[in-house]
Design a protein with these regions (language model features):
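PLP-dependent aminotransferase class I/II
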Residues: 10, 40-43, 48-54, 114, ...
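Phosphate-binding glycine-rich loop
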Residues: 31-77, 83, 91-95, 101-103, ...
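Histidine-centered beta-alpha loop that forms part of the nucleotide-sugar donor binding/catalytic region
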Residues: 83, 97, 104, 158-159, ...
C-alpha cells in the first residue's frame, strides 16, 4: 500500500532542531513575563506584518479571548461567520457576548458584508471576520460598515499568516488581528498564537494584555508583584517561540510553494466550486465542494490521500444550535472537502491528487 499523503505536514529544517536543543539545554523553557525568545518573536512578527504591536500567546483561541477582552462585549452582540473553528464563537461567549452568525460568500467562504449590514442591531458592538482558508475577507466593505456604525473589528486570521490585503500583510488592518500557530498551520510550532494590534493606544493595550496573559500579574519587581484584575495562563513557551522565529524566516517562501500548488489545482482540477486562485491568499486550506462527500473522501482515503472537512458550521453544534437557516454556510458544511496543499508535497504527489480528485468527484 502506498504511503498516505497527509492533509497537513509541517516543514521543519535543521535550524528548528538546533534552536530547540539550545532552549532545552538552557533550562529556560517558559516565561510568564514574556522575555527571551518570546519577546524576540513578538518583535520579528511585528516587523513582518507592519503592525503597531504584537502579543504572543499559547494558542489562537487564547488570542481571540484576550483580544475580545479589550472591548466591552458583555451582554452585547458580535457578528461572525458560522463557518469557522468553534473557538471563534467560544471567545465571544467567554467574554460575555452573544455571537450572531451570518452567512458567507460562497465564492470565497468568507463572511458576506451584505449579511453583516443586515444583522446590525442596537446591541451590536463588534465584527469578527474570519479569513477562511487564508483567503482575505473583503476588509474594505467590512471597515466601511464598522465606521458607519461605530463597531470594532477583531479579525480571526488563524488561517491567514502571510496573506495580504491591499498590498499589506494580514495583521496590519484591524484593531486586533488574531493568529494561530500549530503543526498544521502555515507557520508551524507546537502550539501558539498572537495578537497583532493596530491602534493609537497600542502601548496601553499591550500593557493590559501582558497582565491578562499571565494571570493578571502586574507591577512586577523581582519577586514582588500585584494582581489588579482577572487573567489567564496564556503565555507562549520558549520552544514555540524559537521554532516560530525559524519558521517566520521562510514563511513567504513556503506560502509561495502553497500558491504554486493552488495554481496547479485551479487549472487542472475540474471541480466547479473550489477556492479561487488569488496571489493574496496564504492557502492554509485548499477546499473544493462535492455532492457525494462521504463516498468521495472514502475513495481518496482508499488510495492513500488524506482529506478533511473544514468545518461543521458552528450554529449546527449542540451548544450553539439555532433554528434559523444560514443557507450558503449550511450547503458548504455538507459539501466542503479540504485536500493536501502543504509545501512537502512532491510533484508526483500533486499530479496524483489532481488525477484522483478528477476521477472520483
Amino acid at each position: 500500500m502506498k504511503k498516505k499523503i497527509k492533509l497537513f505536514d509541517p516543514s521543519i529544517g535543521q535550524e528548528e532542531q538546533e534552536k530547540i536543543s539550545v532552549v532545552l539545554k538552557s533550562g529556560f523553557w517558559a516565561s510568564g513575563s514574556g522575555t527571551g525568545n518570546v519577546l524576540k518573536f513578538e518583535n520579528e512578527f511585528k516587523k513582518y506584518v507592519g503592525s503597531n504591536n504584537c502579543i504572543a500567546v499559547n494558542s489562537g483561541t487564547s488570542a481571540l479571548n484576550l483580544a475580545l477582552s479589550l472591548i466591552d462585549i458583555k451582554n452585547k452582540e458580535v457578528i461572525l461567520p458560522s463557518l469557522s473553528f468553534v473557538s471563534t464563537a467560544h471567545a465571544v461567549i467567554i467574554n460575555g457576548g452573544t455571537p450572531v452568525f451570518v452567512d458567507i460568500e460562497p465564492e470565497t467562504m468568507c463572511i458576506d458584508p451584505n449579511e453583516i449590514q443586515k444583522s446590525i442591531t442596537p446591541k451590536t458592538t463588534a465584527i469578527l471576520p474570519v479569513h477562511f482558508g487564508g483567503f482575505p475577507c473583503n476588509l474594505k466593505d467590512i471597515q466601511n460598515i464598522a465606521e458607519k456604525h461605530n463597531l470594532t473589528i477583531i479579525e480571526d486570521a488563524a488561517h491567514a499568516v502571510g496573506a495580504t490585503y491591499n498590498n499589506k500583510k494580514i495583521g496590519n488592518h484591524g484593531t486586533a488581528v488574531c493568529f494561530s500557530f500549530h503543526p498544521v498551520k502555515n507557520l508551524a510550532m507546537p502550539t501558539g498564537g498572537l495578537i497583532s494590534i493596530n491602534h493609537k493606544n497600542h502601548k496601553q493595550f499591550r500593557k493590559i494584555l501582558l497582565a491578562r496573559r499571565w494571570c493578571g500579574i502586574t507591577d512586577r519587581i523581582d519577586s514582588k508583584y500585584d494582581v489588579k484584575e482577572l487573567g489567564w495562563n496564556y503565555y507562549m513557551n520558549e520552544f514555540s517561540a524559537v521554532i516560530g522565529l525559524a519558521q517566520l524566516k521562510k514563511l513567504d517562501r513556503l506560502n509561495n510553494v502553497r500558491r504554486n500548488i493552488a495554481k496547479s489545482y485551479d487549472k487542472e482540477i475540474y471541480v466547479e466550486h473550489k477556492i479561487p486562485f488569488d496571489k493574496r491568499c496564504s492557502y492554509h486550506l485548499y477546499w473544493i465542494c462535492v455532492k457525494n462527500r462521504n463516498k468521495f473522501r472514502k475513495d481518496l482515503d482508499d488510495i492513500g490521500i488524506e482529506t478533511g472537512t473544514h468545518y461543521k458550521p458552528i450554529h449546527k453544534m449542540s451548544f450553539y444550535k439555532k433554528s434559523n437557516k444560514i443557507l450558503n454556510t449550511e450547503k458548504a458544511g455538507k459539501e466542503i472537502v479540504t485536500i493536501p496543499i502543504h509545501p512537502n508535497l512532491t510533484q508526483s504527489q500533486i499530479d496524483y491528487i489532481i488525477k484522483s480528485v478528477n476521477k472520483f468527484s
